[in-house]
Amino acid sequence: MTASYLAELVETWREWDWRAREAWLNRHPQFLADIGDATVHFVHLRSERADAPALLVMHGWPHTFALQLDFADLLPDFHVVVPSFPGFAFSPTYADGPMTEVRLAATMHGLMTDVLGYDSYFTYGEDVSANVNDLIAGSYPDSVRGIVATHSHFPSRAERADLTAPDEVAFFARLDEWGGANGAYGHVQATRPDTLATSLNDSPAGLLAWLVEKLVEWSDTPAGDPRVVESRISRDRLLTEAMIYWTTQSIGTSFRPYYEGADRPDVMSPVQVPASVHIQRHEGDYPESLARRFYQDLRIFERLSEGGHFTVAEVPAVMAERLRAFAREVGAL
């Protein structure tokens, strides 16, 4: 992020036709559902095929459900559900208690089965929903037809201490080095979330800078000019994310996964359901051996030639075709 690019975005935001973007969002049927102690906002795009497979598409941070909709729109052969996690966008946070990954997995599973009535579904998650994705597949194998991952499973820090394979050790050493230089955002969100949120909820420009900086740095674009992010994520989409966070004042509650559990991941058993793993470019050296140990019915493993941290948002057509290929592999299409 640079001051000149931020000024350019702010100026665009001042003149931007939000009503046109709002109309685009509203073309996607949206609902609220009470699931246990949570109220969850979600988009539900039903296929014209009554017997189409169902798909849960979760978002991460710093984005919202809206960034996943270009991907969802390319999947008319699925019933697609795109929820907002509790505390993000139009989903209020849990009334009490921590936002653990196990709790999020139970809420998302309840949405798909108890609320929407799907007997089975595919699941996709990324970033803060990556572990939730794994937990859904591991905890509810009778309901999950398959799991799609672009952020493949990471063993816990305790488990990493026992790794001996050179490529596995080197991968996490590189991540630790990256975190030391680039992970300050996560540390402050995990330790001083309310202080930071007070500032960001008071300044649209500050909020925009905090969000877009991550979208710039984590997308599959060359370093240098931050404007290049718009080749992957258009300016309309960048401003939509900022506008949703601003109007809902949800940046503070979006930090809860960091504050309440990002450094204390829930223990996970290996996943037994069919899995399709697509390694995004920022984790291009992720060892295949890690995926094969955790996803014990790994049908597809590939290293993507394009697409960064926000994979389904950056290369939606690529990932839509990958999903269809996986669904055909397991007999769902």
Kindly give the residue locations of the regions a language model identified.
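Conserved HGGG/HGGXW glycine-rich cap/lid loop of the alpha/beta-hydrolase fold
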Residues: 48-90, 327, 331
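Short beta-strand segments
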Residues: 58, 82, 123-126, 148-151, ...
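Conserved hydrolase catalytic core segment
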Residues: 77, 115-170
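C-terminal subdomain of alpha/beta-hydrolase-fold enzymes, centered on the catalytic histidine
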Residues: 63, 189-333
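Non-catalytic accessory segments flanking enzyme active sites
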Residues: 1-46, 246-249, 253-264
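Glycine-rich "HGGG/HGxG" loop immediately N-terminal to the catalytic nucleophile
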Residues: 20, 66, 85-99, 134, ...
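Alpha/beta-hydrolase active-site loop
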Residues: 98-114
